[in-house]
Amino acid sequence: MAAKVEPFWIRKTLDQLSTEEWESLCDGCGLCCLQKLEDEEDNSVYYTRIACKLLDLTTCQCSDYANRRASVPDCIQLTPGQADEFKWLPPTCGYRLVSEGKDLPLWHHLVCGDRTAVHHERISQSGRMLSENSVAEDDWEDYLIFRAG
């Protein structure tokens, strides 16, 4: 009987992951690409339904991932070295879960084999977002959906 081999996200640290393994932790929810507002009083971060101009509102994929920083200079590129800063990511985020030593959820494509499960389970905001090009920044506060952390 062969020994069970744990999945890479369980048996490796973030620093041990290959580039392909690291990128595959992304569940494709697109929540990290939503505009966020910070409460000046307590520094809480709130997610809005307002998506980055490059985010496809249905697939939740960046329309120009390779060149995104040229169009969106403040686009955050997640790296394993930032794991201690991942608290702002949603609690369902693969990067955050693995950085906290937790397993991936059953709907994650690495577990179930279906990249659309994140949408079927309504983890993503697919079909429920607005492009930042269509909402004045002064109105973003009207579109808060949840508090980070």
Swiss-Prot record:
Belongs to the UPF0260 family. The lineage of its organism: Bacteria, Pseudomonadati, Pseudomonadota, Gammaproteobacteria, Pseudomonadales. It comes from Pseudomonas savastanoi pv. phaseolicola (strain 1448A / Race 6) (Pseudomonas syringae pv. phaseolicola (strain 1448A / Race 6)). This is UPF0260 protein PSPPH_1551. HAMAP family: UPF0260 (MF_00676). InterPro entries: Puta_zinc/iron-chelating_dom (IPR005358), UCP006173 (IPR008228).
